[in-house]
Amino acid sequence: MPRESLHRQNIIACIWDFDKTLIPGYMQAPIFRAYNIDEESFWREVNALPEIYGERGTRVSHDTVYLNHLISHVKNGDLKGLTNQRLRELGGELEFYPGIAELFDRLRELPESQPQYRKHNIRLEHYIVSTGLAEMIRGSAIAPHVDDIFACEFIEAP
């Protein structure tokens, strides 16, 4: 195969999880504080849901079943006024491990600062892939340091 027909990539993608990777806990904590929902009870209920649904013949993902529980709280009025704008605001309350934003920036600059990488136009990009809420991540301090966010969307008017 001729050299010029080979498809060459020059982008290094760093894929980051969010909860307990970039932040010490779960991103939903600011929601629980804002709406006076007991966080421990919420997660205990969520952890019981796969078995409850399983008894009904429905298999659910342990990672995303919490979203159904959040929707139940919205429908029951416990999360009255929860919107994407509010999620973005609450995302601003998320506290990251110390130095995360600086680490993202330093990693991005590394290939640009090395001649052997610069000559090939090697770039480093940051992406967040999470089962968390995208709007909260977009409202957080890390958002300006990432290239894209792939997470769960809160649909206000389905």
Place the predicted regions along the sequence by residue.
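Alpha-helical substrate-recognition element adjacent to the catalytic core
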Residues: 1-157
